[in-house]
Amino acid sequence: MKLDLDARLVGSGASVISAIEAHAAGEPLRIITGGLPELPGRTLLERRRNFARHFDCLRKALVWEPRGHHEMYGCVLVPPGDPEADLGVFFLHNEGYSTMCGHGIIALVTALVETGAIECKGQQTPVTLETPAGLIRATAHLNGQRYVDHVSFVNVPSFVYARDVRVVVPQIGEVVVDVAYGGAFYAIASVEQVGLRVLPQCVSELVEVGEEIKHAVNGKLRVEHPLEDELSFLYGTILVDLPEKLNHHSRNVCIFADAEVDRSPTGTGLSARLALLDAQGQLREEEAITVESILGAESAFRGRIVGRTKVGPFNAIVPEVSGKAFIIGRHEFILNPRDKIGRGFFMN
């Protein structure tokens, strides 16, 4: 039996939105490839504001249930405002919109090259993306020009915002955190302080503690980016643990947005951690470290410092992050105006 609903769906007033599905180190990325309205605006931030103001219903329809889930992550591709960029991109999650996304860059570049959307230019194919946090220069490292082995990208300058911030967490007591920026602001703390491990079986407790820490830091510290007001908010909490693999540096979990758990090691979070480790004198010059996610040793990103600069009054590093991603499917989502539940919901 052949099922062909296209003609009837168009006649019913339904719209179709297409997407490529990918993941980087276990964290999903839903890449919207067609069916969205044109977004006016001279800059990427203007286009994102326009989408958030007029089409946030589409974020909910594509990220929330029944098409997505609480941990779903997506992105929208737009023409770049910067002439140096191949493409503009902004990212979607359960709560709204993020400023940058490391796993998203790795997954998106993999998909762009492997689908032929970006022309392959040899074993190392450069891809430049404009994001809300700035211009990101990535490289797809190919294996025999057939598929992408891994992607590396030079992230935005990253810096430590506040050291040794003491906050009180209910049921736990005082916790010492550092706040650093790597494309977004994070509160970073050792998981040992809260009596947990970064393991899948502890995820409910990790989410609760991560949210409590973020709330406590927001109550004590005003986070302000020195150059861009739209980046001035605490995005998440990173809890750091010992690694599963001896030659890896550490394991961490990031709880971000509305209690969302990153399955990957978090590319922007790793950038923030590199800035913090450098400020603490715990990194040798040009040392590369491998950081695992809550999923274990197979879910890992590699990071190193490739430069130094200033961001306003802050000493900053220029981080490079690399990791693997895979295309896992494609979708054609049907948005029917008669389907009210299909507009998006969460059970929590």
Regions found by a protein language model. Name each.
Residues 183:
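Glycine-rich ThDP/TPP pyrophosphate-binding loop and its adjacent helix/strand module
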